[in-house]
């Protein structure tokens, strides 16, 4: 058995009048991500971490933003696809550790639902998904409330 680690990152600008979806959950907020799909930064970074750990490219390779069929797509579909590819390559998800960076809204109260949504899309127990939230202390686009970002590390074991 071998262990592999992947890292993922995503950032989206925020605009008024768009839905804010993070970790598969729609959050009450007046801004949401500008993106080709639903703009779920956590799901996108997680997808990249999983694909990278397995040596399977990145989210843009599998779901190019130039393809109209992914316009407005639910990012949970991306995670389900990544899980299918991991299964085909005989990889099991051991652990996911994520940080979402945003000034608002506060994410902590929504973590249980996010963990359930992510675990469900990946077919793993919620104990394998760990989430944290940080602010940028008012610094840069994230700190000014103009963007949201996520960093994710995923650990896989070969079966």
Tell where the protein language model's regions lie, with residue ranges.
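Acidic (Asp/Glu) carboxylate-rich active-site/surface patches
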Residues: 109-110, 140, 144
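SAM-dependent methyltransferases
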Residues: 1-2, 159
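Short acidic capping loops at alpha-helix termini that bridge into adjacent secondary structure
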Residues: 125-128
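RNase III-family endoribonuclease catalytic core
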Residues: 2-113, 117, 121-122
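A generic structural signal for short coil/turn motifs at secondary-structure boundaries
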Residues: 30-31, 139-141
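C-terminal edge-of-domain segments
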Residues: 143-159
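Pyridoxal 5′-phosphate
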Residues: 131-135
């Amino acid at each position: 058995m071998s262990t592999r680690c992947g890292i993922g990152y995503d950032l989206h600008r925020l605009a008024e009048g768009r839905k804010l979806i993070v970790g598969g959950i729609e959050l009450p907020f007046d801004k949401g991500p500008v993106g080709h799909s639903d703009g779920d930064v956590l799901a996108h970074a997680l997808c990249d971490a999983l694909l990278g750990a397995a040596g399977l490219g990145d989210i843009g390779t599998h779901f190019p933003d130039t393809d109209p069929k992914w316009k407005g797509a639910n990012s949970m579909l991306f995670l389900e696809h990544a899980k299918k590819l991991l299964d085909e390559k005989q990889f099991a998800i051991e652990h996911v550790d994520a940080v979402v960076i945003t000034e608002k809204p506060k994410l902590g109260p929504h973590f249980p639902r996010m963990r359930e949504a992510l675990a469900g899309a990946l077919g793993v127990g919620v104990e394998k998904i760990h989430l944290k939230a940080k602010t940028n202390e008012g610094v840069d686009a994230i700190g000014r409330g103009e963007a949201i970002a996520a960093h994710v590390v995923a650990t896989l074991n070969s079966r």
